[in-house]
From Swiss-Prot:
Function: PsaA and PsaB bind P700, the primary electron donor of photosystem I (PSI), as well as the electron acceptors A0, A1 and FX. PSI is a plastocyanin-ferredoxin oxidoreductase, converting photonic excitation into a charge separation, which transfers an electron from the donor P700 chlorophyll pair to the spectroscopically characterized acceptors A0, A1, FX, FA and FB in turn. Oxidized P700 is reduced on the lumenal side of the thylakoid membrane by plastocyanin.
Cross-referenced PANTHER family: OUTER MEMBRANE PROTEIN, OMPA-RELATED, PHOTOSYSTEM I P700 CHLOROPHYLL A APOPROTEIN A1-RELATED
Reactions this protein catalyses: reduced [plastocyanin] + hnu + oxidized [2Fe-2S]-[ferredoxin] = oxidized [plastocyanin] + reduced [2Fe-2S]-[ferredoxin]
Protein name: Photosystem I P700 chlorophyll a apoprotein A1
UniProt binding sites for phylloquinone: W692
Subcellular location: Plastid, Chloroplast thylakoid membrane
Alphabetically ordered keywords of this record: 4Fe-4S, Chlorophyll, Chloroplast, Chromophore, Electron transport, Iron, Iron-sulfur, Magnesium, Membrane, Metal-binding, Oxidoreductase, Photosynthesis, Photosystem I, Plastid, Thylakoid, Transmembrane, Transmembrane helix, Transport
GO biological process, any: photosynthesis
Organism: Spinacia oleracea
UniProt: chlorophyll a binding residues: M683, Y691
Gene for this chain: psaA
Residues engaged in binding chlorophyll a': H675
PROSITE patterns linked: PHOTOSYSTEM_I_PSAAB
Organism taxonomic ancestry: Eukaryota, Viridiplantae, Streptophyta, Embryophyta, Tracheophyta
Length: 750
């Protein structure tokens, strides 16, 4: 930490009325580009309009103007998010059985959509229990609402209206901070101030206010609900906030007010700030007193973190100093120059943020089932499966986005003349070693992981089960994973004497939590089958990284195309006249990376879905005997490719294939339709531009004959456009197929 004289304070941070509000410009498609604004001559125009509308770099090269457009667009994004949230809460208030579910969450399923009786579609309204007919939802909103202490549909209405107000406010802010008071570039680049505000404000005060809400509103209301009190009898949030005696009846330490806090006698508060570990046996969710404690602790950490950086007062860390001090014995100039990169290239900044947020989203996916945070979430198998799948897909997309923007940074924002011997330059100079080693790792993982399966298929086909890799023949136990599980299972007694259970029941031990006769969570055994599929995960992830990293490291130049940077981020080939140079642009690497990301995530969600149905989810008898949905068949069936096809894909597709004539029939139709969308993508991916141009010209001839030819000349999609349309339908079709398959299955059997 350096103490120096105060830096001169920045006085004027905004420009007033920089861009006049013009409806004429809004009404003109492509007003941001001279070429597009002329209007369409060929059908390529509409594609270019979509490609460039949000590519602010192509509108202007002025960094301040680009920054303002991004900033304004963020408010628009927030507005849409608030609108979406409002819609969710409105559906809960207007069309749902939330109050009925609240009174009996183990026998009544969540529903917030009732289909109108048009041409027989009301068949979709299944019986979710309690006399309510509607579509069963798997978003987890009911569980979140209960955890936050919402007890009536009126409260949901109020929240929905509140979210609408915020949506309007965000729209206004987006307009105001672009047209009326637009921040100067210096404001966007003041990273210390931004860190202080984001850490202390958003994360610190945000967590503190949530912890406050949990303690004063959620905890007491959930106490009442768990005790079986009728939601209509429970005191309202404002009564709990204003009347300390009410809370003191549930949590005696409330009677003492803030005295224990100021006298440092904090253990007094242990009745509502706990450290128990494990799950609440009534709801199958984390102890809400544990999560309140967690948010309070997080708030303290971030409030401290938000006071670490030097702004107008000459005390604290400067980010530039920190980065430039980061030098190792083998890293040359180290992080020198990184500060300039991250304050002038928003693509570089975004790439880092997407990589971290994507990884975090995948971590969230895993925590949602291992440490289910909301009441009655763990026993709602459809929601558990949906939340895992959703967060895995989102994480995958965000990580591919990170590679995309890293490559755009390399092409558009990287200045090789000012970068010498810093970390980035050193990575670029030994990129051949990185990529060739990574390629070797992919080949090794691919052949060995797949080879283990093929061995098992062969032995199985030859009737030699004793020669297979399995828990009952040649064992390949995941010993490191089992060691980690065991360490965590034993941890509470050693590292956290106050805790009664480990962080997650999945680690091991003898604990099993069941709610209403359904398993919430139990220790998850790992064996040979998990060892095999884990190495498939390692393989697919490494291939995805290989493709994406190659795209970034060779975005500016390669031996094949030394001047690649001049061709831009996306180009079809370095031609004409140079064969063998197609599909080398940074954009093409993102395109190819998306397919492998899809492979990676598919294997993960298949593994999760089958493993949970086989070894975790199921019912428990009065004698304590657990019957799993697929009877523990994962360990012996998933060790062959044939087992995956027969006992997972085919066996579990029976529900979606036989859904016609039932309330799940929409999933059957989606299953069919999404397969079609997926197959449609192959038309774009497997045929070239010339084929379609020829066809189009013959169709145009026919139109001319009939004198119905359009003024805008039809053109085949460009190579890049065709691949973009192809990968979009491939992913959309694949994801929707999986969604229909999973939900029809789990709603029918879960």
């Amino acid at each position: 930490m350096i103490i120096r004289s105060p830096e001169p304070e920045v006085k004027i941070l905004v420009d007033r009325d920089p861009v006049k509000t013009s409806f004429e410009a809004w009404a003109k498609p492509g007003h941001f580009s001279r070429t597009i604004a002329k209007g369409p001559e060929t059908t390529t125009w509409i594609w270019n309009l979509h490609a460039d509308a949000h590519d602010f770099d192509s509108h202007t090269s002025d960094l301040e103007e680009i920054s303002r457009k991004i900033f304004s667009a963020h408010f628009g994004q927030l507005s849409i998010i608030f609108l979406w949230l409002s819609g969710m809460y409105f559906h809960g208030a207007r069309f749902s059985n939330y109050e009925a579910w609240l009174s009996d969450p183990t026998h009544i399923g969540p529903s917030a959509q009732v289909v109108w009786p048009i041409v027989g579609q009301e068949i979709l309204n299944g019986d979710v229990g309690g006399g309510f007919r509607g579509i069963q939802i798997t978003s987890g909103f009911f569980q979140i609402w209960r955890a936050s202490g919402i007890t009536s549909e009126l409260q949901l209405y109020c929240t929905a209206i509140g979210a609408l107000v915020f949506a309007a406010l965000m729209l206004f802010a987006g307009w105001f901070h672009y047209h009326k008071a637009a921040p100067k570039l210096a404001w966007f680049q003041d990273v210390e101030s931004m860190l202080n505000h984001h850490l202390a404000g958003l994360l610190g005060l945000g967590s503190l206010s949530w912890a406050g809400h949990q303690i004063h509103v959620s905890l007491p209301i959930n106490q009442f609900l768990n005790a079986g009190v009728d939601p209509k009898e429970i005191p309202l949030p404002h009564e709990l906030i204003l009347n300390r005696d009410l809370l003191a009846q549930l949590y005696p330490s409330f009677a003492e007010g803030a005295t224990p806090f100021f006298t440092l006698n904090w253990s007094k508060y242990a009745d509502f700030l706990t450290f128990r570990g494990g799950l609440d046996p009534v709801t199958g969710g984390l102890w809400l007193t544990d999560t309140a404690h967690h948010h309070l602790a997080i708030a303290i950490l971030f409030l401290i973190a938000g006071h670490m950086y030097r702004t107008n007062w000459g005390i604290g860390h400067g980010l530039k100093d920190i980065l430039e001090a980061h030098k190792g014995p083998f890293t040359g100039q180290g992080h020198k120059g990184l500060y300039e990169i991250l304050t002038t290239s928003w693509h570089a900044q975004l790439a880092l943020n997407l990589a971290m947020l994507g990884s975090l989203t995948i971590v969230v996916a895993h925590h949602m089932y291992a440490m289910p945070p909301y009441p009655y979430l763990a026993t709602d198998y459809g929601t558990q499966l949906s939340l895992f799948t959703h967060h895995m897909w989102i994480g995958g997309f965000l990580i591919v986005g990170a590679a995309a923007h890293a490559a755009i940074f390399m092409v558009r924002d990287y200045d090789p003349t000012t970068r010498y011997n810093d970390l980035l330059d050193r990575v670029l100079r030994h990129r051949d070693a990185i990529i060739s080693h990574l390629n070797w790792a992919c080949i090794f993982l691919g052949f060995h992981s797949f080879g283990l399966y093929i061995h098992n298929d062969t032995m199985s086909a030859l009737g030699r089960p004793q020669d297979m890799f399995s828990d009952t023949a040649i064992q390949l136990q995941p010993v490191f994973a089992q060691w980690i599980q065991n360490t965590h299972a034993l941890a509470p007694s050693a590292t956290a004497p106050g805790a009664t259970a480990s962080t997650s029941l999945t680690w091991g031990g003898s604990d099993l939590v069941a709610v209403g006769g359904k398993v919430a969570l139990l220790p998850i055994p790992l064996g040979t089958a998990d060892f095999l599929v884990h190495h498939i995960h390692a393989f697919t992830i490494h291939v995805t990284v290989l493709i994406l990293l190659k795209g970034v490291l060779f975005a500016r130049s390669s031996r094949l195309i030394p001047d690649k940077a001049n061709l831009g981020f996306r180009f079809p080939c370095d031609g004409p006249g140079r064969g063998g140079t197609c599909q080398v642009s940074a954009w093409d690497h993102v395109f190819l990376g998306l397919f492998w990301m899809y492979n990676s995530i598919s294997v993960v969600i298949f593994h999760f879905s089958w493993k949970m149905q086989s070894d975790v989810w199921g019912s428990i008898s009065d004698q304590g005997v657990v019957t799993h949905i697929t009877g523990g068949n994962f360990a012996q069936s998933s060790i062959t490719i044939n087992g995956w096809l027969r006992d997972f894909l085919w066996a579990q597709a029976s529900q979606v294939i036989q859904s016609y004539g039932s309330s799940l029939s929409a999933y059957g139709l989606f299953f069919l339709g999404a397969h079609f969308v997926w197959a449609f993508s192959l038309m774009f991916l497997f045929s070239g531009r010339g084929y379609w141009q020829e066809l189009i010209e013959s169709i145009v001839w026919a139109h001319n004959k009939l004198k119905v030819a359009p003024a805008t000349q039809p053109r085949a999609l460009s190579i890049v456009q065709g691949r973009a349309v192809g990968v979009t339908h491939y992913l959309l079709g694949g994801i929707a197929t999986t969604w229909a398959f999973f939900l029809a299955r789990i709603i029918a059997v879960g």
